[in-house]
């Protein structure tokens, strides 16, 4: 395993119960075999301003906890919630809000989404430009020439101690 990507906060804004302990453990073990720690936040917004504020609040909280420097990349987890999917316009607004908050905090930004979102909801301008972490639970990734994901999540069954 070369790295880990950790959930930062819950919908309430509270830290995930294992987040700080996991970040501390990872930070003390980064070496040539285990090189990075990314953070992700599931979006609960549908417009630019709310997305910007949600991301900025999360990143500020992480900074105050003293672990923002451990963040290799901050990922927006963009999936349907509240009983419906995003529209392309909503997805673009949320991506823009999160991306601008990450840039202001000096943290590289990435996008986590499933293949359906990448193909049908996310504007190609984003999927081609952003560091992409794709979920596709299959034995093969399929044709990804257009958007070239950097990370492929093919299972949700793995675990790591801690």
Locate predicted features.
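Residue-level detector of flexible, active-site-proximal loop/helix-junction positions
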Residues: 46, 82, 116, 139-141, ...
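Aromatic-lined carbohydrate-recognition surfaces of secreted/lumenal glycan-active proteins
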Residues: 36, 105-120
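Substrate-binding cleft of extracellular glycoside hydrolase catalytic domains
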Residues: 1-105
């Amino acid at each position: 395993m070369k790295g880990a990507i950790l959930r930062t906060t819950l919908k309430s804004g509270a830290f995930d119960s294992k987040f700080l302990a996991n970040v501390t453990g990872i930070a003390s073990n980064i070496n040539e075999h285990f090189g990075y720690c990314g953070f992700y936040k599931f979006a609960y917004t549908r417009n630019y301003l709310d997305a910007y504020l949600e991301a900025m609040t999360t990143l500020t909280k992480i900074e105050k906890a003293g672990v923002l420097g451990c963040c290799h990349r901050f990922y927006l987890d963009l999936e349907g919630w509240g009983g419906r999917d995003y529209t392309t316009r909503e997805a673009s607004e949320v991506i823009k809000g999160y991306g601008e908050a990450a840039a202001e905090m000096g943290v590289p930004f990435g996008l986590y989404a499933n293949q359906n979102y990448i193909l049908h909801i996310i504007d190609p301008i984003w999927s081609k430009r952003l560091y992409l972490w794709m979920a596709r639970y299959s034995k093969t990734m399929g044709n990804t020439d257009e958007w070239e994901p950097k990370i492929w999540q093919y299972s949700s069954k793995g675990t790591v101690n801690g």
